[in-house]
């Protein structure tokens, strides 16, 4: 009779109790250790330069451009030292984005693979890894060229032997590092905790945060002579830090907001309360971080190419109007983020595919006819949500550059919206994985306790039956 209250208490565990329960779970601890060991291995290999490479004291952070910084962010932070993971996961992410775009109605065979279940998903993944190879080769070559030639300034990287054989070796090594990083990410996803690819990128961003704050304070301080200069530096750094914290909280809030479209199964009967119906969740920021990556890439490529050109009028135009440190560049960047948000969210949600799947499975939206009407309704809801999500994503993307311009920081030290969104997304996914593991552990304990109770009850029943039969056996004698 006292077992029921104990079970009820276990179901209402707080976070500390759940964490303690997880730490006592052997399977969870093995998965946790696998995750930690692989992340540490990734970070160690990311900070060791390749043989024959000398990183100058100025480092890559001070000399890097926007294109360089984006590679470093998506690659996992190995670009700073030109390590084995210099390009890291960036080519794989580029290949994934291309496959997502091509898997729409652009290429019908790929669209069929997407709808072919687990077999189709495996084939899509195999094609993605094949496409990763040319991306890795091109990005590795671009990284070496940018790192060893800063457009006429001091080069942040020195190759002790810049012969074609050594350059080919570096390209092959970085390409191999891409596939090794993908392998580490897949291993974490399968045997560890959370999404491995996201955690690898997160580890690189978090590893650079302290260094970034220190570098920002150093740039802001300059040569401190008077008390007023010290106070001005402190105020500027406080604005810089508070902008980072504010964007983190705002991004967390908008990332978790969803618009719920109620759905119903045909033949289920009439349900009067919409709260009792299952629903289709559409996130306010359904496009995720992809629009920011697209916009950053498009804006940074012309500026990067211009750095290798002589001082001409075209180079002056690009650097003066397309750079993210200029007002025109920031405005154009914001427009691109909005356009890509509408475009990519439509690809992600795909109202046409959803409407067809609803019709095949016998589901429908109450008050909306199946088929084209359902597709139009979902598309209409998506457009309305994007009128909120796209401007908000744009604000997150451009505020770091505005703050950097106000307090006179280089773009390489700006708190990019891409990194902030990745941090929030990765942490939310990881916490969700922990909650799922805690729930699974709790259910396992409940099942074990129930099995023990059933075994005890069966043993007691058996003993009572034997005691009941014992007098009868005694009477036979």
UniProtKB/Swiss-Prot annotation:
Q: Do the record's keywords include Chaperone?
A: no
GO CC terms, sorted? plasma membrane
Annotated TM spans: 28-48, 67-89, 130-150, 165-185, 196-216, 234-254, 286-306, 329-349, 387-407, 413-433
UniProt membrane topology term: Multi-pass membrane protein
Q: Where in the cell is it found?
A: Cell membrane
> Keywords on this record?
Cell membrane, Membrane, Protein transport, Translocation, Transmembrane, Transmembrane helix, Transport
Q: Indicate yes or no for the key word Cell membrane.
A: yes
Chief location:
membrane
Q: Which cysteines are joined by disulfide bonds?
A: none
GO BP annotations, alphabetical order: intracellular protein transmembrane transport; protein targeting; protein transport by the Sec complex
Q: Which InterPro entries match?
A: SecY, SecY/SEC61-alpha, SecY_CS, SecY_dom_sf
Query: HAMAP family of this UniProt entry?
Result: SecY
Q: Which family is this sequence assigned to?
A: Belongs to the SecY/SEC61-alpha family.
Query: Quaternary structure?
Result: Component of the Sec protein translocase complex. Heterotrimer consisting of SecY, SecE and SecG subunits. The heterotrimers can form oligomers, although 1 heterotrimer is thought to be able to translocate proteins. Interacts with the ribosome. Interacts with SecDF, and other proteins may be involved. Interacts with SecA.
- Outline what the protein does: The central subunit of the protein translocation channel SecYEG. Consists of two halves formed by TMs 1-5 and 6-10. These two domains form a lateral gate at the front which open onto the bilayer between TMs 2 and 7, and are clamped together by SecE at the back. The channel is closed by both a pore ring composed of hydrophobic SecY resides and a short helix (helix 2A) on the extracellular side of the membrane which forms a plug. The plug probably moves laterally to allow the channel to open. The ring and the pore may move independently.
Task: Give the protein's recorded name.
Answer: Protein translocase subunit SecY
């Amino acid at each position: 009779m006292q077992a029921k209250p104990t079970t009820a208490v276990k179901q209402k565990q707080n976070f500390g109790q759940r964490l303690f329960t997880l730490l006592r779970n052997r399977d969870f601890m093995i998965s946790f250790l696998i995750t930690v060991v692989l992340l540490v291995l990734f970070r160690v290999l990311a900070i060791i330069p390749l043989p024959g490479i000398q990183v100058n004291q100025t480092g890559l952070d001070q000399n890097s451009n926007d294109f360089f910084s984006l590679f470093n962010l998506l690659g996992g932070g190995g670009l700073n030292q030109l390590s084995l993971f210099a390009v890291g996961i960036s080519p794989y992410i580029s290949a994934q984005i291309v496959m997502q775009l091509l898997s729409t109605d652009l290429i019908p065979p790929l669209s069929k693979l997407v709808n072919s279940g687990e077999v189709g998903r495996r084939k899509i993944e195999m094609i993605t890894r094949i496409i990763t190879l040319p991306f890795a080769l091109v990005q590795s070559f671009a990284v070496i060229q940018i790192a060893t030639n800063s457009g006429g300034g001091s080069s942040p990287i020195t190759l002790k032997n810049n012969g074609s054989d050594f350059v080919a070796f570096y390209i092959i090594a970085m390409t191999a590092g891409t596939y090794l990083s993908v392998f580490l990410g897949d291993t974490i996803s399968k045997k560890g905790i959370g999404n491995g690819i996201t955690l690898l990128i997160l580890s690189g961003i978090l590893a650079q945060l302290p260094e970034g704050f220190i570098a920002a304070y150093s740039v802001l301080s300059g040569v401190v002579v008077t008390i007023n200069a010290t106070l001005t530096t402190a105020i500027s750094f406080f604005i810089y830090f508070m902008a980072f914290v504010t964007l983190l909280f705002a991004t967390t809030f908008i990332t978790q907001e969803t618009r719920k479209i109620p759905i119903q199964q045909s033949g289920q009967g009439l349900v009067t309360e919409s709260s009792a119906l299952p629903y289709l969740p559409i996130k306010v920021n359904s496009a995720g971080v992809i629009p920011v990556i697209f916009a950053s890439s498009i804006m940074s490529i012309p500026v990067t190419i211009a750095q290798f050109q002589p001082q001409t009028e075209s180079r002056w135009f690009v650097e003066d109007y397309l750079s993210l440190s200029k007002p025109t560049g920031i405005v154009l960047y914001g427009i691109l983020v909005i356009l890509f948000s509408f475009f990519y969210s439509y690809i992600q949600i795909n109202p046409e595919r959803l409407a067809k799947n609803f019709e095949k499975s016998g589901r429908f939206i109450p008050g909306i006819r199946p088929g084209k009407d359902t597709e139009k309704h979902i598309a209409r809801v998506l457009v309305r949500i994007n009128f909120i999500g796209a401007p908000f994503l744009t604000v997150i993307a451009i505020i770091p550059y505005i703050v950097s311009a106000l307090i006179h920081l280089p773009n390489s030290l700006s708190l990019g919206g891409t990194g902030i969104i990745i941090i929030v997304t990765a942490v939310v996914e990881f916490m969700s994985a922990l909650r799922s593991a805690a729930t699974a552990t709790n259910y396992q304990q409940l099942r074990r306790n129930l099995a023990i109770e059933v075994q005890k009850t069966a043993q007691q029943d058996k003993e009572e039956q034997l005691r009941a039969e014992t007098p009868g056996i005694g009477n036979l004698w």
